[in-house]
Amino acid sequence: MNHSDTLSLSLELLQQPSVTPIDHTCQTIMADRLAKVGFHIEPMRFGDVDNLWARRGTEGPVFCFAGHTDVVPTGRLDAWNSDPFAPEIRDGKLYGRGSADMKTALAAMVVASERFVAKHPNHKGSIAFLITSDEEGPAVNGTVKVIETLEKRNEKITWCLVGEPSSTHKLGDIVKNGRRGSLNAVLKVQGKQGHVAYPHLARNPIHEASPALAELCQTVWDNGNEYFPATSFQISNIHAGTGATNVIPGTLEVTFNFRYSTEVTAEQLKQRVHEILDKHGLQYEIVWNLSGLPFLTPVGELVNAAQTAILNVTGTETELSTSGGTSDGRFIAPTGAQVLELGVLNATIHQINEHVDVHDLDPLTDIYEQILENLLA
């Protein structure tokens, strides 16, 4: 069977067991290909994370492909129908960890760039790649550190296409033009431990905190807007007690998360949480962690270039969306770049037997190449 350039490169990348934060030569494989067509290669290692900044051209505007070579752990190997790091094609589907999220997109980006450069060796502006091996993990030494480095030397990205698997039912039907912000908190409520038979000698933090937690759950934080759904508040963990049935716990720990729209700020959310907790008279400590600001790329050059390319290649009228979790776009957008996420179908990401339709790989490559044509030819 003759494999297309994109499928062949996908297979090579999928054979690398690059579980976060280990890159396992994926970036070297990509860099070798890019260097042959005139990209300046700049590896950037921070801590235990490998990052790649590759650029062809010295002028603006800068079009950047962004993505990650790391994958999530496989889960139980005996639950897979084939070795997750020995990619297999069965019934027109390519199976392997990272097939959807997001090594096939990385392959498509490289091949699209090779083809575009062959046709337009003197293209305007610059093409760049920002690739990390720590998107699925803590995301501390990955894209955010590369962006810090670029900002220090005033190297700006104009347009950024992140190859995250954005599609839902067919290739290109959904493009992410923004993401909600993500704000995490760990709340510790202080009570007084005691015997369940003598509640008057103790203070039960579960009982004391319950009305406040109920109010937090029922609060309408905002109503969203035309781009974002309403802000959501979700409790993810509650811990209290010694495990014994006759002991009132002394402390309660609650972990919760906000996925928030551009209608509120993280500071406003924090303030309202404190007001509710204080109103209920709780003795508490709270530790906040802002893992991503919301961002939005309005309709403009990048959105138009992507929508036109998708329509030309697939005939699909694409829909803009800001749903889903966070991505590394949250680190790139604050620099002023227009950011879009466009990739294969996301139905099996992070799952056992993760796979992608083989027949989507070449059209994705064509879409990426045509976006380059629309912006830099």
Curated annotation (Swiss-Prot):
Q: How is the cofactor bound?
A: Binds 2 Zn(2+) or Co(2+) ions per subunit.
Q: Which Gene Ontology molecular function entries are recorded, alphabetically?
A: acetylornithine deacetylase activity; cobalt ion binding; succinyl-diaminopimelate desuccinylase activity; zinc ion binding
One GO-annotated biological process of the protein: L-arginine biosynthetic process
| Pfam families referenced in this protein's UniProt entry, alphabetically | M20_dimer, Peptidase_M20
Q: Where does the signal sequence lie?
A: none
Locate the active site. D70, E135
The record's EC number reads 3.5.1.18
Does the record's keyword annotation contain Cell division? no
Keywords tagged on the record: Amino-acid biosynthesis, Cobalt, Diaminopimelate biosynthesis, Hydrolase, Lysine biosynthesis, Metal-binding, Zinc
- Which residues participate in Zn(2+) 2 binding? D101, E136, H350
Functionally, this protein is described as follows:
Catalyzes the hydrolysis of N-succinyl-L,L-diaminopimelic acid (SDAP), forming succinate and LL-2,6-diaminopimelate (DAP), an intermediate involved in the bacterial biosynthesis of lysine and meso-diaminopimelic acid, an essential component of bacterial cell walls.
**Protein name stated in the entry:** Succinyl-diaminopimelate desuccinylase
The organism named in the record is: Acinetobacter baumannii (strain SDF)
Gene coding for it = dapE
